[in-house]
């Protein structure tokens, strides 16, 4: 008897196990939730899990920031939407902007624009109960895969190692 009010905009976590060993954890907030078919002893539900950063796509703004660096402006945007799990891993100092305008764009679009102008990228670190947004100006600081994952589009058969079969 789950309702959307109980689930939407709440923290959720997807844990992936292989041979009873935790191999990955994905933490986020529920953006979409639907109830599917109900059977004799079960009900199917579907949900969309997104990073908390997606909250910034829900608000449009027009405003001016004065005498702030891009990390300071990004911090303001995140804190306004209740996002406190973030960090900056920068190799250089960002210049203070005398004047910075957000005009009729979502907070997320504004964040993306400022990050691109400053040469910043972001990634997420998923831990139990939270995900942390990390801004960086150096690609070598981004998380790396332990080993390559093969891409296999052929259906059927049994492959002993993990692989990617489709991208969307």
PLM region descriptions:
Residues 1-168:
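Amphipathic alpha-helical and helix-coil boundary elements used as assembly
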């Amino acid at each position: 008897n789950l309702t959307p009010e109980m689930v939407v905009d709440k923290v959720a976590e997807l844990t992936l196990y292989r041979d009873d060993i935790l191999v990955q954890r994905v933490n986020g907030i529920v953006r979409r939730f639907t109830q599917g078919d109900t059977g004799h002893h079960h009900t199917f539900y579907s949900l969309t899990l997104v990073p908390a950063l997606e909250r910034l796509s829900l608000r449009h703004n027009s405003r001016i920031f004065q005498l702030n660096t891009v990390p300071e402006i990004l911090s303001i945007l995140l804190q306004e939407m209740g996002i406190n799990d973030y960090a900056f891993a920068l190799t250089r100092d960002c210049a203070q902007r005398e004047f910075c305008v957000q005009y009729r764009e979502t907070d997320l679009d504004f964040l993306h624009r400022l990050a691109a102008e400053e040469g910043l990228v972001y990634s997420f670190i998923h831990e139990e109960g939270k995900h942390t947004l990390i801004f960086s100006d150096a690609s070598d600081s981004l998380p790396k895969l332990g080993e390559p994952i093969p891409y296999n589009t052929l259906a059927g058969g049994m492959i002993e190692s993990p692989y990617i079969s489709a991208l969307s």
